Structures are given as C-alpha cells and as structure tokens.
Amino acid sequence: MRHGYYADTYPMKYRVYRISAAFFLAIALPLFFSNAQKGNSVEEEIIQNETIQMEEIPEIKSEYDGTLLAAETGLYQVKEGMLWPLWTKGSVSRIVKGKSWFFLTSEGVIKSDDLINFEDISEGLPHLTIKRYKDGVKSFENQAAALKDLKMHPQNPDVLVTMTRDEVFITRDGGKKWWSLGFCARTNGAKSIAVANMKDSDGVERLTVFISHPLYGLSYIQPDRKNASWIDITAGFEKLPTMSDPDEIADIVPVCYVDETGNTTTEVYLSQSYIPNIYKLDWDAKKAIKIGEKNAGSNGVGGNSGVELDTIDSLFVDGNTLYFVCRNGFSSFNLGTRQFDGAPEEAELWETLSRLSGRRALCLYIPKGVTKFSKPVTLNEMWLFDMEKPQTQYADVAMDKRGLYIPAGQNNPGSQLQGFIDTAKANGLNTVVVDMKDDYGLLRYKTDNEKVLQKATISSYAIDIEKFIKQCKENGIYLVARIVVFKDRNLWRYDGNKYAIVDYATGEPWRGIRSYDYETDEDGNVLSKTATNYYDENWVDPYCEEVWEYNIDIAKDLVAKGFDEIQFDYIRFPTDGLNLDRVKYRWRDTGMDKESALISFLSYARSNIDAPIGIDIYGQNGWYRSGTRTGQDVELLSPYVDVICPMFYPSHFEQYFLAQTPAVERPYRIYYYGCYRNTVIARNKVIVRPWVQAFYLAVSYDKTYYDKDYVKREIFGVRDAIDRGYMYWNNSGKYDYISPDPGDAEYPY
C-alpha cells in the first residue's frame, strides 16, 4: 500500500417543558441531541438544569413555531415555545416539503403528512447487509444503503429523486414506488441530484434528472425518451490545473420563473465543492456559465497566494438572490449584479439555530413568515458552520498530533528508540507510529494474551512493550499502534489457509500475479502461460468475522498496555494482480459487498475499542468522493473512525498532476487541496491527519525536485489547509529531510 500507484416515537418517557429561548438554545436541545451518547434521559438532564432563572428570560416567540431541526439523533420541532422530538430512529440529513413531508434519513426515505405519523417509503431502494459479531455469534442487519441526496420536482411534488453511490432512483407517485435510472459512470461516487422539466430545442418540455459525479462533473438523463441514457455536460465548469474533467459539483437547484404571459422558464444553478464558484446552466448549449467566483484573480498555487479554500453548497434562490451555506457560515450572491453580497440579514438566526445541537444540526427548515423570504427556507450541509473542530468524540485526545513512523526493528527501548524521540522533539513533533502487527502479520511486541497467541506469531525482533511505552511516556510522546489488517501472511497460512482469499479457478489460496511467462508457437500464438512473479502480498478475507476478532483483540491488548491510538492499515481489498478477476471471498455472506464488509468491521472495532481509531487510505480515496477499487469510501467509513490518514504522496500520483508552473509548488498544492477535500468529503466527522512523504522515489518529478524544501512544502500545505496534524513516513527510518514544525511562520517560498 505504501508504494502502490493511484492511477417511531421518542424511545423514553419525558415531560414537555415550556422553555425560554436562552434555555432552549443553551441547554435543552443539546441535551436531546447528546442524550444517546451520554446515556441519561432527557427528563433527568432537564430537571438537573432547572435551577436556571428562566423567568428572567423571555420565552421562545411564536414566530419561530414550525421550525424543524434535523440532527444525528433525529428530527425536532419548535412549537408553542416548546421543544418536541418528532422522529428519533436515526439521523436526518434532508427535509423536503411538498404536499407531504419527505426526509432523507439513515433508515432510508421517510414520509409524513402530519409530523405525527411517519412512514418508511424506501421499498425498492437498495439496502446493505451489515454483519454484527458478538461473543462468537454473528447476525445480520438489513440497513438502508447510504442515500446521497433527495430532491423534489419544483412543479410536481409527486416526483422525487434520490441516489446511492452508484445508482439513481425516481418516484412519480410520492414514494409509493421507486424506479432505477441506472448510473452515469462505471466509477462509483455521487454528490448532488435534481429533477425538473427542461425545454429542448424542439420546444418540448421533458422530464430531466441531473446528477453530479466526483470525477466527471454533471450528467443528465431524460427517462421518458426512448432508449434514454446518461449524457455528460462538462463544458464551462472549472477544472483543477492539469486535470481534464470538471471538479466536483456540490449542489444543483432548478428554479422556475413565470413571466407576465404565464410561461414558465426553468433555470438551473450549480456550485462546486472545493472551488467556490457559482454557475448557471445554458441548457441550449449544454454548458455551464460561470457567474460567480469567490477566488477571482488567484493563480491557483495555494494558500500562500491568497487562495481561500471554501465550499458553496445548499443553494436556495429567493427573488434575485441566491443564498448558500459556506465554510463557517452563510453568504449570498446577487443574480442581477453577479456580485457576492455577504451574509444575509437572517444569518445570525440561521447560525444560532444551526448550533443548537450538542454535536451538530445537519439540516434546518424555517417556515415562511419566520423570515422575510417569500417561501420556506431549507438549509442543508450545516456541518459546514463549524469547521474549527472535527465532530468526533476523541477530538480533544487525537487533535494536533504531529509525528513520525518508526520502522519495525528500529524501535528497541533504550538508545535506539531515544534517537527517534530526540528527532521528533527537535522538529516539534509529539507522536510516534510503530508497527505492532507488521506487513507480514507478525506481532512486533511480546504479549501473554492467550486469545491473541492462539493465532499470532511473534517476531523474533519483538520489543519489550512495557519498556517501550514507559520510555515514550516519560518523554511526553503520544503513541499510535499501527496494525496491518487484511494483508497478513501469518494469518493467510494459519490452519491450512482457513482465512485466505482463494482463486476460484483453482481453489488454491490466491496471490496477485505480477507477470507471466508465455509459451508460443512459431506463429506467435500463445499456447500456455505460467505465473513467474507474484506480488509480495498475502490477503486474508475482509468478510471474515474471525479475522476481525483477531485484529480487534490485538488492538484491545495494546490499548490496555498503554497505547493512545489504534491505526489500521490495509483496511481494504486487494487491488493488484493480473489475476484479480479470479478472487473468491469464501467468507462473504449473502447480500454483502466491499463497503458493507468494511463498515461491518469498523463498526465492530468501534464497539470494542475504547480509544481513538484511525485508518490509512489511498490518497486518491481522500481526494475524490469515491471508494472505487479498494472499498475505502470516506463518506461511508467516517462515522466509525476518529482519524483518517490519507497518503497524499506526490510520488504516487500521476507525475503531471498539479505540476503546473511553478512546478516546484506541487507538493504544497497536493497537501493543501487534499487535506481540505478529505475533510469536506468526511463532513468534518474525523481528524484528517495525512501521511507526509519523507522519502525519495525514483519517479520523474522526484528526480528533479525532491529535497528538504519538497518535504517542507508538504507541511506548509497541511498547515494552511486544515491544520490538525500530520505524520512523516520513511520506511527506512531516515528523517534527514524533515524540518522543525513551522508553527505560524510565513510561507518562505
């Protein structure tokens, strides 16, 4: 992996309290939202806080009545000065109002006519099979597949569209039945969707569904056409320098305008996720027209040149103004003057409402009349309001960790270990990452844990873990235990290859073939081929619950001994081998796929490890909203971990990637943009702590540019984007090219 190239009702008894505005904002609602984590009943929490002098503070005004707030723990409403939980069976991320209410939730699509009775209308939408494993017994849950968005036709409230990461669905009867429209690409990943009637060049209005793909821009389909298929629209959208495809589109909103004669015209507005631009779609020309650019005039180098990383999402049009959610707040754009007007008058109220949750509000619905607008306001992606701190329970523990990797065999307690500790301290670092189960599955520490020892092989170079931990703690070092999970030669061989993935053609344990020798006849026709070279990787089955249990037992053992954090590497499926199409996963249960396997494993890990959990991922999976090839879908995995460590190694990307003039700035750009993109994809649920390339690889860019400044530029890129820590990687343990952490120093180049 290190050198692989990337080409019901409220479930408790409660009283309803008439509450003051201040009490509502500061105490009551956060308690509802945090109740599931803390374990106390809402009634108990409110009673404990009733000492507040509520009579001195005016009650919530009736003008706020009807406001809906969606959160991780459900749906809530302000009514008659009281706080009401409406639906608390899961998280809610979208609120859509037509003739009925529709909600995008973790349980699928939910419908309500009265906000009292709620109906699951997800029949026909896909589900994931999630495996649960406890005390040696496995069970299964049929969990709704993650739905990315939910939109309603602006003229027909019976027509709605939604999508998973690789399939689009439409209903024409208010959710009674969903039809698949397929998908716009072979590569999975999706962000936004929309539906409207669009007038074609022949004068006919046709039902049109739009979708944004993280790699390929905008696509549309007109499902009522004969032999309908997805068509891309790429012209006009901004691309990152050196890239051929548009950067990700964050939101799509069709707006219907009626002229004096009663004719309706539909305009489509769009924004981008990582480049803060606003577009209007020229439907006739099938191209985007850029009408707003927050970073106009920048040269694209990065933060040192004045480029501000920002996101424009959750578009809402009223009159001649487009409102949107952006990093740490709201803003607006005048469609007439094509100027950014800044925060609207209502921003303070919206922001106050957005921060009601003890963790976060995901979505907000404000009825017409509460604000000056001519229609209700719905705001999504409200996690953007609070980008200062990641929303993980271990944020205070795992934030601001800067460290280096100590290779196995070089971390013996005493002078050898002290050398790395001294290097760390001299460079402003406070963390070390060490192999505790290495790339071959060998334990690199001595343990007497009988459960672990049943399957483990302890390396002859295993360290005295107690002495190691003691020495690190005496030096104030934060300890991260790296555990290589599914690439494990020891477990691959165990008990007659019980846990190995197999070659379905031969029935033998599978290994990735790197090359063949071919036998040919005199005309060059291939008669036979023989595998002559294999990848140095032995993969166990990621679907296997006994493999999960073994790795989690090791993690629990290490936490008990004193490690601060567990870091899982090779938390993925194999990606290399000319025979990759012959892999068979014997432990795969019916209905499971790669994503459900990794979710199941990490859910099992989360429920058993009382410490921060980190995962290493390919740089490409941190850059794009897609889990293609590896199953490492950041959106799906981020709820189960605290730290994501993307490997944004410049040497591992295509060598032209972001190498525009001045090419020397490429390492800065990759980490600057990459850290922000990964954080946005994860919706700020995790700490993004990247691996930083502190090694030379004989590729064209490194041959020209690799030096101490190359590594320093990477660190400045991390700092200027989302400054939450980093880790140096050098497989040989040679850190001659690292520099002291820059702190607040000016960018020197």
Name each model-derived stretch.
Residues 421, 425-462, 575, 581:
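Aromatic-lined carbohydrate-binding/catalytic grooves of carbohydrate-active enzymes
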Residues 417-441, 561-565, 643, 721-724:
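Catalytic domains of carbohydrate-active enzymes, especially glycoside hydrolases
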Residues 384, 641-655, 664-672, 677, ...:
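Substrate-binding cleft of secreted/luminal carbohydrate-active enzymes
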Residues 432, 551, 558, 569, ...:
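Conserved, mostly hydrophobic/aromatic
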Residues 394-412, 486-557:
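Active-site-adjacent "subsite" loops/lids of carbohydrate-active enzymes
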Residues 478-488, 567-574, 594-630, 685-696:
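Aromatic-lined carbohydrate-recognition surfaces of secreted/lumenal glycan-active proteins
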Residues 78, 111-112, 171-172, 221-223, ...:
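Conserved Ser/Thr-centered positions that define the repeating blades of beta-propeller domains
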Residues 45-63, 84-98, 122-155, 182-199, ...:
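Short coil-to-beta transitions that initiate beta-strands within beta-rich domains
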